[in-house]
A protein has these predicted regions:
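His/Asp/Glu-rich metal-coordinating catalytic cores
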Residues: 1-55, 60-218, 236, 241-244
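Structural motif
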Residues: 30, 197-200, 222-224, 266-272
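A contiguous, basic/glycine-rich beta-loop/short-helix subdomain that forms a polymer-engagement track
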Residues: 116-118, 232-286
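Cysteine-dependent PTP/DSP-like catalytic domain, specifically the C-terminal lobe
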Residues: 218-238
């Protein structure tokens, strides 16, 4: 068996891991590193064209953004992900099957669990030719919003663990306190706070954290964020009960064009990539 780290090691973005066996080969994730000189994974045409499977841990661009490129380079295998992840992708692979319906071929073992990063996010344990590998994906045991199936007792010959924030000396609790302190400085002055967040993931966690701190302050969001709030209220597979109960009395409002007085506001684009969102951020900063 050969394992190749084709991206995502020593860099943030283009997560991609190739496993080649005697009878088949597969990828775990195929991410894009936006703005880089080489944004795509380090894969040769032969490696791509002989792939049998692609397993996706979740929908974020640094794990799935190179999917169109992969198919352009000749990938003709089958992509697998949770049903929730497949529903979140901008463009689904030509051959995509949800893991809930996947029966591995003889010689391949695939187990998976929820990784606590966002709705649909998972880790994998894959067995091939007498060896097993654990791929954690973006994994956390401390999410306020999402459920995690712990990997602590999973045994494998090789573990590929996400550690993007490994060098960060602060704990999650410390960073949350810093965020609340910064938000409080604005809210106590009757100023609104704008949070650019990914379409799927930390937005709901921030909404819960901030609502618990200031239950009287209204929450605003763009159309996508409002849809995520509705989804969270009814989902029992990926979200924690604390999230559903904590946000059960919240009636989020559509985000207005101008900053409301003392509001908690969400837009579903962490990079503020449109002129309209840049202008909105300037109005909040003014």
């Amino acid at each position: 068996m050969r394992v190749k780290f084709a991206g995502g090691v020593g860099e943030h973005g283009r997560s991609c891991f190739l496993v080649e066996g005697e009878t088949l080969s597969f990828l775990v994730d195929c991410g894009l590193m936006a703005g880089a000189g080489q944004p795509y994974p380090d894969l040769t045409p032969d490696e791509i064209q002989t792939l049998s499977f692609l397993f996706l841990t979740h929908s974020h661009t640094d794990h799935t953004g190179a999917l169109p490129w992969l198919e352009e380079q000749g990938f003709s295998g089958t992509a697998f992900a949770s049903r929730e992840t497949l529903s979140q992708l901008k463009a689904s692979p030509r051959r995509a099957v949800c893991l809930e319906r996947f029966t591995p071929p003889t010689g391949l073992m695939v187990d998976w669990g929820r990784s606590g990063h966002c709705g649909g996010s998972i880790w994998y344990q894959v067995g091939l030719e007498g060896h097993s590998i654990l791929f954690s994906g973006d994994y956390t045991e401390h999410s306020l919003a999402y459920t995690t199936d712990l990997i602590r007792n999973v045994k494998a010959d090789l573990a590929v663990l996400d550690s993007a924030y490994g060098p960060e000396p602060q704990t999650a609790a410390e960073m949350r306190r810093e965020l609340l302190t910064a938000a409080e400085r604005l809210l106590t002055r009757q100023r609104s706070v704008l949070f650019p967040v990914p379409k799927f993931g930390r937005g709901l966690e921030l909404a819960l954290l901030l609502h618990k701190a200031w239950p009287e302050v209204p929450i605003y969001g763009d159309g996508h964020f409002l849809g995520q709030m509705v989804w969270a209220a009814h989902d029992c597979l990926w979200t924690r009960e604390e999230l559903r109960l904590g946000l059960s009395g919240v009636a989020p409002q559509p985000l207005p064009e101008h900053p409301p007085a003392a509001g908690i506001c969400f837009v579903s684009d962490p990079q503020l990539r449109t002129f309209e969102l840049e202008a909105l951020a300037r109005r909040f900063a003014g």
